[in-house]
Amino acid sequence: MLLRFSKMHGLGIDLMVIDLISQYAYIQPQHMRAWSDRRCGVGFARLALIEVPQDPDVDFSCRIFDGDGVEVDWLASDLCCVARLVADKRLISKAQMRVEVRQAVLDVQVHADGSVTVALEKPELLTEPTALAQAFIEQPRHAPWRLDSCFTMLTDNSGSHALLRVVDVMQVPMAELLEHLEAHACLPLGSVISLLQVQSRQTLIVQMWQLGAGVIDSFSPDLCALAVLAMQQGWLDRQAQIECGNGTVSAHLEWLENAPQMYFTGSATRIYEGQIRL
């Protein structure tokens, strides 16, 4: 059979999205692995399946898989793409939707300009200083990235996250900084390192890397945690634009003080429609 699909791009991540409401198919992990191949298949970072929900009070269900065919946790960027497609194809005839995802039901709104707002639970944050080796912090005073005696460690549901506030993220030689971090074992492999530049009270610029893996150029859950921390510290207003990936990825975040939810607004683009033989 020929299976209809859509290719979407949102906030630095490309998705293959399959509507299983208007068509039926039994999709197995080996299919997903073949389709994820960027040379011989469709090529994608993640795959989203739109399905009929189990709960009658929910508009649709969405499951997310990686390129190996393993079901993974959802990202806000996934929901921006899926909700935009559902609205464009009129699978659901309303702008405000309730979406059933892995271990959650989320409220999503598609706006007239195509952007999508997702209501997210505010991350619970723990911050503590982490001492750096003396040899590591003894950098020349003229270095624009000369460090204090410790990073701020931010711990949330996504794991350990070390952040450093700088004047200009573009002046930091990150390859050199990462080399020092790995050499001195200041932080465990897999830790996320973020440089934060507060451009204004409405704009936060972030560069992110993962030790042992490289640059993070898509909108990850860590960015929501960073935005909440910056708001708690008084660096940002309660509504702010967050930019990462050298300015190629941006989203708007709103968090009212002491509110249990925050509102994430991002964009998504439909690249093309296609069919693939199952």
Protein language model features and the residues they cover:
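Intrinsically disordered, low-complexity regions enriched in acidic/Ser/Thr/Pro/Gln residues
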Residues: 116-120
